[in-house]
Curated annotation (Swiss-Prot):
A Pfam family it matches: Acyltransferase
Lineage, opening ranks: Bacteria, Pseudomonadati, Pseudomonadota, Gammaproteobacteria, Enterobacterales
Organism, as annotated: Pectobacterium atrosepticum (strain SCRI 1043 / ATCC BAA-672)
Family: Belongs to the GPAT/DAPAT family.
Reactions catalysed, as given in the entry: sn-glycerol 3-phosphate + an acyl-CoA = a 1-acyl-sn-glycero-3-phosphate + CoA
Protein name, per record: Glycerol-3-phosphate acyltransferase
Amino acid sequence: MSGWRKIYYKLLNLPLKLLVKSKVIPADPVVELGLDPSRPILYVLPYNSQADLLTLRAKCLALGLPDPSQSFEFNGVELPSHVFINDGPRVFRYYVPKQKSVKLFHDYLDLHRANPDLDVQMVPVSVMFGRSPGREGHTQAAPHLRLLNGIEKFFAVLWLGRDSFVRFSSPVSLRYMATEHGTDKTIAHKLARVARMHFSRQRLAAVGPRLPVRQELFNKLLDSKAIKKAVDDEARSKKISHEKAQQNAIALMEEIAADFSYEAVRLSDRVLSWTWNRLYQGINVHNAERVRQLAQDGHGIVYVPCHRSHMDYLLLSYVLYHQGLVPPHIAAGINLNFWPAGPIFRRLGAFFIRRTFKGNKLYSTIFREYLGELFARGYSVEYFMEGGRSRTGRLLDPKTGTLAMTIQAMLRGGTRPITLVPIYVGYEHVMEVGTYAKELRGAVKEKEGFMQMVRGLRKLRNLGQGYVNFGEPLPLTTYLNQHVPQWRDAIDPIEAQRPSWLTPTVQDISMDIMVRINNSAAANAMNLCSTALLASRQRSLTREQMHEQLDCYLQLLRQVPYHKDITAPKKTADELLEHALGMNKFEVEKDSIGDIIILPREQAVLMTYYRNNIQHLLILPSLIASIVIHHRRITLAEVVRQITLIYPLLQAELFLHYSNEQLPRVLETLANELTRQELLCSRDGQLAINPPRIRTLQLLSAGVRETLQRYAITLSLLCANPEINRGTLEKESRNMAQRLSVLHGINAPEFFDKAVFSTLVATLRTEGYITDSAEAAQGDIVTIYNILGDLITPEVRLTIESASSSTEMEASTSSSQTAEETTQG
């Protein structure tokens, strides 16, 4: 580098250091993209900009990557370490590749041809200041003079220097390019052309399409044939004028539609960055690269997160923005459309949806057309398939209405592929968890409003870590091609279609998404410590016992991970415990022997929420432990037989991903891991408890205790009264569960949750144990109940069977009275 250039760079660096605070995407490109700092790198930038180059240089030095401003020397040949693909805006609009970039690519390829051991990493990098997509209809022509471009860059750095990011892309091996494609100038030209297309797609993924002018969007919707027909039907059915019906339609559009604003997003990012840094100790994001790739490949993206808290809306948009992606349009419940939250959310991309569409054809038509328009324009969308926040910490059964509308949008004949992206959202503290516990115990849900929001803000402190894990995407076109090959026959650009395959397909996809969300779960200090303490009947463990139990969980999660997408803590058991104690949920009592970790009674109910977040990760090892403890010695084949009978119930409740064919192998692997940890012994082909580690095994087995008790309740009722109808079975199961929780101190509100028993009874029907004619397959029911009966304590079993007998007697008495009255009549 010449002396004058060094002086120029130093002078330019002074204002950049003050004005620019860029974010690197991904956060650790060395690890996430597989960059090798020890190998030379050719940085490829889209436009000739010294400000961009120096911004990149600062980040490269901070990451330990080669300096892009320093030349690369090899065998006496000196080449620049960076290349600009294009000079930037020109007098003429059409693209002319920068000849210097083509020559430099050719020089590098030629160097690889002459030196077989050389392998330079070509890394595309884009530096962006600001991400405003602009509005439709606004002409924003590119400047025609380089001087104007320089002035624009100056103001961009001045105004948007804090809203900038440096996006690294996956490296391309120039050794591979030279070997596979040759080294002539044609390949160099192709590299420049491909790089230009790459940057164009990357910018669209980061900025998104232009935003609509709201009134013009409404006018377009009103002109659609579907809404015109719905307006005519509204006027006719309600006996009102066409103008009045159209005003009703516009009012509904005003209620539904977002009013997205880049400036609002930028301002909220400042506020949220300040807020998260004070409330959270960190936001952990995993597998975001797969979503960035989808966006860059031109997919229409539908984000489908689990719903834990009202915080989800803000957290997900914040995370996506910081991953270099456009914040999505978010389907929010109409209950959040209150002042001042409603207008703010609307500017951040929220569009509002009512709880039910029944009886309002105009509303459902407008909502469906609006959603279809979002997809057609290329905006990403986010909705919560559970329909509401989970009160138990487990995933809720999916609501399929919005997903059905998504597929109907595809049936309008759009060319853009739509891909569903499941997202697991996890917290170490959910601010609404106290309210959830009250609602599960029967309290009326408090209506959202300004005062409730203020009270909620007062609870925002010491929130620990947050987790956002992107699951395995589900491309809808690929899915439909595989499962409904004839789906394209239903394409109609005018009318919304409801082909016969739509409902079952939507149901299958929704269940698949729930499974994929659980496949990307994040275990953390709070839910692991809660799991351990709630497993103890006294809700207390010594520090040594806590260490052993946490270590058991960690080894299971690391050695036999539930799925490749789950994340387990990298900290040690002691570090996790110290972190959890810092959350002020647990108490420490010291005595002459050591520390005792205590979960206070008032906190125990709340901690079940966090335990339930990851219950599916540990349910199978817990079940193995429970079976071995209660049988003392048992063959693996018998363990597999018993779990295979119970598994469909667990699978439906917890959205487990193992198939029946995979299950035996998984159980064998888990049993081997428990043996490796010396929790079990393997003798003479049988599994047995290892007495020195019995305490850890008992605590592990407790993770499935309440689940088995619930199943025993329902199956006991079926054994006692095989002809009981589904509604009565659910009701009696809940009543008995409430009784059991009082008599045996089961301090978990979800133990008698209506949704849990509804899912259980529905699964029994699906598996053929009960039929629509209210008949039970008695032999199979008794077999499963006997297995469950051996896995619960004698006291609990006695209570269940006593209550079931009473219920049977009441049912018999009621039937006799009915028969007698019929005879007398």
